[in-house]
Amino acid sequence: MQHEDKTPEQQENKTPETELQQENAPATPQEAGAAGSIDDRIAELEAKLAEQQAAVLYAKAEGENIRRRAAEDIEKARKFALEKFSSELLAVKDSLDAALNVGSATLESYRDGVELTAKQLTAVFEKFSIVEINPVGEKFDPNKHQAIGTVESEAESNTVVNVLQKGYTLNDRVLRPALVMVAK
């Protein structure tokens, strides 16, 4: 036995750490290579982990950037949604201002100017899908009409007989219902 050849001092110098080192120490060069390949594998996996963590951080940052840009785009869309419509209405306003600045106009010229301005406004409405609701003679529709009252009429019951104020829709959505009188 090998332990018997050692002096008592050498045997006493054994500590649990040295015993553990001796037990874990590779006995052959193959085991030493395997230990090296394990270290290499650990280093490789740590590198992959760091790479994946960086990719996750990049993806998070990219997601935040997309959310921020989308919020900015929504804010701009809200802010400038009426820009085209507003610019089209400016021509109508200009026509009204021109009519008011005419010095010696006749009633007929005012009427002609108002008719032209109304045509301009109607063209703007058509361009932006604003449709007039003028339901005289139609069945009363509570989704598009607001009944102000009922009147005796020769028309069929529940039929619109008079429009007090026209209504309007925007892309088939009611902006303002028509104010109507309905037959009893």
UniProtKB/Swiss-Prot annotation:
Keywords: Chaperone, Cytoplasm, Stress response
Biased composition (Basic and acidic residues): 1-17
A Gene Ontology biological process term: protein folding
GO MF, one annotated term: protein homodimerization activity
TM segment ranges: none
Cross-referenced Pfam families: GrpE
Protein origin, superkingdom: Bacteria
Main localization category: cytoplasm
Residue segments, region Disordered: 1-39
Biased composition (Polar residues): 18-27
Annotated GO CC locations: cytosol
Subcellular location: Cytoplasm
Alphabetized InterPro entries for the sequence: GrpE (IPR000740), GrpE_coiled_coil (IPR013805), GrpE_head (IPR009012)
Protein family: Belongs to the GrpE family.
Role played: Participates actively in the response to hyperosmotic and heat shock by preventing the aggregation of stress-denatured proteins, in association with DnaK and GrpE. It is the nucleotide exchange factor for DnaK and may function as a thermosensor. Unfolded proteins bind initially to DnaJ; upon interaction with the DnaJ-bound protein, DnaK hydrolyzes its bound ATP, resulting in the formation of a stable complex. GrpE releases ADP from DnaK; ATP binding to DnaK triggers the release of the substrate protein, thus completing the reaction cycle.
UniProt xrefs under NCBIfam families: PRK14139.1 (NF010737), PRK14140.1 (NF010738), PRK14150.1 (NF010748)
Oligomer status and interactors: Homodimer.
Record's protein name: Protein GrpE
Upper lineage: Bacteria, Pseudomonadati, Pseudomonadota, Betaproteobacteria, Nitrosomonadales
